[in-house]
C-alpha cells in the first residue's frame, strides 16, 4: 500500500472519488523556445531541462527570460499551473513537474506539458511524485534512448480527488 493509499484510508475512511485527469484539468503542450534564446532580462520562462536540474517542487520566481517577441509566440502557464517535463533520458525523470506559484504568466518550453486545474496545485505536484502515479506513468512511456509521455495521454491518468 502506498503512502497516498494509507492517507486516504486514514483520513477518508469512506474513500474518495477517483477521476481521470482530463476531467479535472486541461493538459496542453509547451512552446518551442530553446536555451539559446535566454536573455538577461525580459519575459519569464521555464525550460523543461530546469525541472530536472535546477528547480524544486514549487517555483515562485523565474530563473531565465526570453525576449517579449519570442514570448508572444510561446505557450504560457498561469500562476497555479503545473509544468511537467514529458521527455527525458530515463523513466524516473520523465513527468517530473513543478508548481508555478509566481504572480505572472510564464513561457514554457517544448518537451513540457502545462496542466491547468481547479485542484490544489501543491496536491497535484505531490500526486505526480507518488507511486500511484508512477505505476500509471509506466503504461504511457515510449521510446528507448529518449523516453517520452505524450501530453494527451496524461488525460487518462486516474487521480484521487481530495
Predicted features along the sequence, with ranges:
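Short, solvent-exposed loop/turn positions at domain surfaces
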Residues: 10-12, 32-33, 70-71, 101, ...
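A short beta-sheet element
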Residues: 47, 62, 68-129
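Short loop/beta submotifs within extracellular cysteine-rich repeat domains
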Residues: 4-5, 15, 32-33, 53, ...
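A short glycine-rich beta-alpha junction/loop motif
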Residues: 105-112, 119, 142-162
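Short, structured motif recognition centered on aromatic/hydrophobic residues
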Residues: 16-24, 43, 77, 81-83, ...
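Non-catalytic DNA-recognition/assembly elements of restriction-modification systems
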Residues: 3, 7-30
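Amphipathic alpha-helical segments
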Residues: 15-19, 124, 155-162
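Sequence-specific dsDNA recognition surfaces
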Residues: 22-35, 49-81
